[in-house]
Curated annotation (Swiss-Prot):
It is an enzyme of class 5 (isomerase). Keywords: Amino-acid biosynthesis, Cytoplasm, Isomerase, Lysine biosynthesis. The record marks 168, 217 as: Could be important to modulate the pK values of the two catalytic cysteine residues. It is found in: Cytoplasm. GO terms for molecular function: diaminopimelate epimerase activity. The keyword Lipid biosynthesis does not apply. Pfam families: DAP_epimerase. The gene is dapF. It comes from the Bacteria. Its EC number is 5.1.1.7. This is Diaminopimelate epimerase.
């Protein structure tokens, strides 16, 4: 079948975006992998699908598929591209839209300067809700946060566990460029303490309102940016007493700004760019 698509990116985190709102889409995992393949397909970190909502009071349903074909709960950089896509495609003329994701509803707002602000929801730190199996794990308090000891490649890594609708393990490192992200990342991603796997974040503190971040994403590997990862890292840093909002998060793909008041019931707000790269049509095997 022939499929129209739009290639987009948010701070270098790149996506294939599909309109499932005006046409029925029911892609298989094999088809998702084919689209995301950088050699034989379009190429992307994730595939984003716009659909009609299945709950009342929202504008759209937002579905995210990793390049390995698996569906995931949330993607912050994709959310910014999502609102640009639905506006550019004239599916809505609203500047602010409410969007259904797997674990709730988020609000996306297009700014006059072209950046998008995303209400990312409140972070969750309770291990069982991340989910993280904390039974018998060595732990220590730092500020208002709890750090857990993970054995990774023969070393002990102290991580904060956070859910931003998807699971994250965040650690602070001295030099994020020199740190073995590509070695430790896949080990943390598949650590047995995380039953749904996990996104592994590596954060270098530059100043109280500035960090550098690399994220090894669950099912995608290291990406140029990760919006939920940026939020998880900032939330952990604020709880540990290391950061003050707003925080500039520098990734390999660009800079995101994260704001949070430190209250567990309060949403994090993420601001950053969204860009269309090109539109096209691809022949996809049934």
């Amino acid at each position: 079948m022939k499929l129209k698509f739009t290639k987009m990116h948010g701070a270098g985190n790149d996506f294939v975006v599909l309109d499932g709102y005006t046409q029925p889409l029911n892609l298989t995992e094999t088809q998702v992998r084919a689209l995301a393949n950088r050699h034989f397909g379009v190429g992307a970190d994730q595939l984003l699908v716009v659909e009609k909502p299945t709950v009342d009071g929202v504008d759209f349903r937002y579905r995210i598929f990793n390049c390995d074909g698996g569906e995931v709960e949330h993607c912050g950089n994709g959310a910014r591209c999502f609102v640009k896509f639905v506006r550019d495609s004239r599916l809505t003329d609203k500047r602010s839209v409410r969007v259904q994701v797997q674990k709730g509803v988020i609000t996306l707002t297009m700014q006059d300067n072209g950046e998008v602000v995303v209400d990312m929801g409140a972070p969750v730190f309770e291990p069982v809700q991340v989910p993280f199996d904390a039974s018998g794990v060595e732990a220590r308090r730092e500020g208002n946060d709890t750090l857990y000891a993970l054995e990774v490649n023969g070393e002990t890594r102290w991580v904060s566990v956070v859910s931003m609708g998807n699971p994250h393990a965040v650690q602070v490192v001295d030099d994020v460029e020199a740190f073995p992200v590509l070695v430790d990342g896949p080990v943390i991603e598949t650590h047995p303490r995380f039953p749904q796997r996990v996104n592994a974040g590596f954060m270098q503190i530059v100043g109280r309102s500035e960090v550098k971040l690399r994220v090894y994403e669950r099912g995608a590997g290291e990406t140029l940016a990760c919006g939920t990862g940026a939020c998880a890292a900032v939330a952990a840093g604020i709880r540990r007493g290391l950061l003050d909002a707003p925080v500039k998060v520098h990734t390999h793909g660009g800079t995101l700004t994260i704001t949070w008041n430190g209250e567990s019931a309060s949403s994090l707000m993420m601001a950053g760019p969204a860009a269309t790269v090109f539109e096209g049509e691809i022949e996809l095997a049934d």
